[in-house]
Amino acid sequence: MTLREDDTGVSVLPRQFPTNRGGLCQKGWTSAELLDHPDRLTTPLLRDPVSGELRPATWDAALDRIATSLRAIQSSSGRDAVAVFGGGGLTNEKAYALGKFARVALRTRNIDYNGRFCMSSAAAAGLRAFGVDRGLPFPLADLGRADTLLLVGANPAETMPPLVRWLTEQRRGGGQLIVVDPRVTATARQADLHLQPLPGTDLAVANALLHIALTEGWVDQAYVAERTSGFDAVRRSVAAWWPARAEQLSGVPVADLEATARALGTGGRVIILTARGAEQHAKGVDTVTAYVNLALALGLPGREGSGYGCLTGQGNGQGGREHGQKADQLPGYRRIDDPAAREHVAGVWGVPADDLPGPGVPAYQLLDSLGTPDGPRALLVFGSNPVVSAPRAARIEGRLRDLDLLVVADLLLSETAALADVVLPTAQWAEEDGTMTNLEGRVLRRRALRPPPPGVRTDLAILADLAARLGDAETAAARFPTDPATVFAELRRASAGGVADYAGIDWARIDDADGVFWPCPSADGPDTPRLFADRFGTPDGRARFHAVDHRPAAEEVCATYPLHFTTGRVLAQYQSGTQTRRVAALRRAAPEAFVELHPDLAARLGIDDGDPVRVTSRRGELRAPARLSSGIRPDTVFAPFHWSGAGRANSVTNDAVDPISGMPEFKICAVRVEKA
Amino acid sequence: MTARVVIVGNGMAGARLAAELHAREGDRKVTVLGAEPHRAYNRIMLSTLLTGRIAEPDVELTEAAGHGIDLRPGVPVTAVDRSAREVRTGDGERISYDHLVLATGARAVVPPLPGLDPTDLPQRVVPFRTLDDCRRILAVADGARSAIVLGGGLLGLEAARGLATRGLATTVVHHTGHLMERQLDPAAGAVLAGTLAGLGVTIQLAVPATGVVADDTGVRLDLADGRSLHADLLVLSCGVRPDTALATAAGLTVRRGVVVDDRLRTSDRNISAIGDCAEHDGALTGLVAPAWAQARVLADVLTGTDPLARYRPRPVVTRLKAAGIDLAAMGDAAGGGPGEELTFADPARGTYARLRIRDERLVGAILLGDNPAIGTVIQLFDRGHPVPADRRALLLGRALGGAGAAPSASPALMPDAAVVCQCNTVTKGALVRCWRSGARTLDAVVAGTRAGTGCGGCRDAVGGIVDWLSEAESVEVTR
């Protein structure tokens, strides 16, 4: 988008860009409202020890308070007693600086971020199959030319409306759109074929699709032989998923499975995309892997116009997971337990590799350990609101309250900031330069329109200020520059040679080329719009199959909790709603939480449209008005997760996590529903 | 915990039990003795193997291996010595067990017809049960032009469909008046016969066979009505009988199958039986789903993962799905009695549905042909969930009242509050107001309201409203 500022304020204009082609949803149009919002924080807040209330304070007082506490906690309880929690909305520069701050200034292993809640399962599945995790290994425009496009657990019509322009183009061109979703979403309504499985059964659906492809002879045997390894084990495991078995489990008719397999197996350009619906399960990595297996067996990845991809969620969902705010990661998508990676990054940072901490624990495990005898006693939060967004949120809220020190940097008083001991007001999007990396692996520029308001500092400045107080001021100033361009220059060096190699990218090149696709190792060499044409990112260049099997959800329905509960987004709100709930037009469009349920179920429960209902799980309850819809299965209820308080969907969700990615099972748990 | 488990049988039940044990914690040695010399395979796929579209490796199943699993295909067990807790194998080896599991399956029944000696069948006469049977059928079918399948039950029809797909002129001979009489009512059987005829399978009903004459050149099947049918191949699909020989010889309680309790225990507490060879509560299973459920329960009990696990039979769904055939039968659809009955029949298009509902639950259903709600019906039956208030949903699927409100034919009939552009929450009223304030083109209305600037999906609808506004003389709009 392009911004214009005049006497009346800042206004937003759509921009013809290769990804959105001028499209903006309501959140984009109204985003400037947040710049001068009356709720904007413009001064640090310190919790008054006597009254217990947050009171305005000077920056020096706030930063001194933080530094003093951090030093005391680390000297008494060790370096890991301080933890850092980041966000997938931070720019690449900020995500990079945050990871470096944790490892170099705090020297704690405990850093992770909210991307663990929304992309980590696809990331893990992509890494183990392809050796590379880039949301789409091809340009978004390929979607518009696909003969067959399978969307699994993705609802872009509500979560990413401009992307739907590509779907429209695809279908106008005669392509077939198939959507897998337990609900008849706005996206599913546009599909030629909608598979509506019981939540938690997408993996079985994928295995049955591959079973059919095998029995119909649609597997690309030459590709499997030349470009992959491990297929025999997958072939044997999907032999046990004959379509009627998957039908009974998922409710998807065999005829629909066959039609889907045929469209995938006999189409020319075929793309399979997964999103949160496939990922947010305790078996999310395996579920995504099942669709990756299907794509590999059909010979899609690396074939121009075809492929597998993941629709990344947050603003900088891709870049945010590449440069070191993940517990096990160093910049350039390197592993923190890889000695060569440690040497390289430590060299760039000017510290001995041995001084870098080892891997920490994934987000939920980290949050759940806060304030416990062996867990961190202090937490610094940047760009995240776990009180609303974490699963089993009431428990996490309790953990945050048990901390000795909670620091939250945000532009608004989020629900998490409201619990903090120190709140630091930060700059926001139109006030900072930097880069983001979109779902295509395309590095984009964000340009500052104007400086932050008086009293507000950037995240980079906050990290520099804290580093100066925690160590030698001169060293800190060199290590933590506040200018994003300087940080990006260092990020380039740190990422050089890594999987996500930014070494050849500079801001001017991004401006000239409408973004630059990583890997881009050299300033005078090409970038990489398409991955995998010749080889995959594994040591031997072959993609890896992994045999995966369906398993039940961590919590299945029972007599006491007889209904499936699933969560998701609505168009006019975003994430924990801290920002979008404060925009009047968005509030009008989606004013409050709701519980979506089928009219048959509602009738049995004596619930009318609009009645207040209570959804109860083993972990908590949610109260919101009923919204009746025949687009949801009668055995399943849905609630959006953008609201706090009584309408907080995450009071109900399960905190079971995927054993590989650590992603929580937001998409399925067992509940009972009654009139409130 | 049980230290040494010996499983006799590496079929669908035995192999599954080995995998279930493998997946559970604990230290134990599991020996799987399979009489067949093959890797574990999926019997359900054998009819697809007959079509020639897949090869033998495609029917192989994942085998539990390593971690204490000793898998020995091609090792038949000849005796069980209960006092010594040993089994004896074909080559005389003795293998000790702490717990023995019989998963010996069932054998194909060779009907008592003149010309058929079960121990020495002619080369062109083959039962349809095992992978070796399949190989023999394929060996004969290769170069054959015609086949007869004796038996019009589920397996016989699958075999016939597979052979017809290979291009063989195939005839099914069935002794009763309609196909799959255990699952279907006569009307459904007739629709199914019509469907099969369309796929090139000839059906001969209500004619018992009386004898078989076979030599190197062909097979003749004599029928009770005096006719004789000639073909290159005769496939026997006349049911199966539990393989209880070991259990009987060992003195275990055997009726039709090896009698087991809810824990799958036989009359010897150190011996269990699962799958087709077992008889639970007077019933034989004969299908994969109950066999796998038994394997799960037995693994829970044997490993102590859930010592209280008990096998509870669930109602079974019979499913026949192949190119051109889509059949599901469950429960008692034709039983009559109290309750509601839903029916739909379109024989010309091969569609038939009959469902019985009692106390808001499905108690039986027969669905044949194009039934879009088939997945829903199976799940409602399997899980015992209440049926939709509007029963038509069971016949017509979600085509009924499903996806959102259809756009109104005319903008005049749309309420002002109707949201035209979802992405930017623009109502019809907002578009009208924009037009009234001077916007006279689609682009101007879009610029003024942002309608159509998100996903772009409503551009046509917005255009339609602008056209209507241009033509209408005066439009009232509520604020």
Model-assigned labels for residue ranges:
Chain B
Residues 120-144, 214-222, 227-293, 297, ...:
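FAD-site-proximal beta/loop scaffold in flavoenzymes
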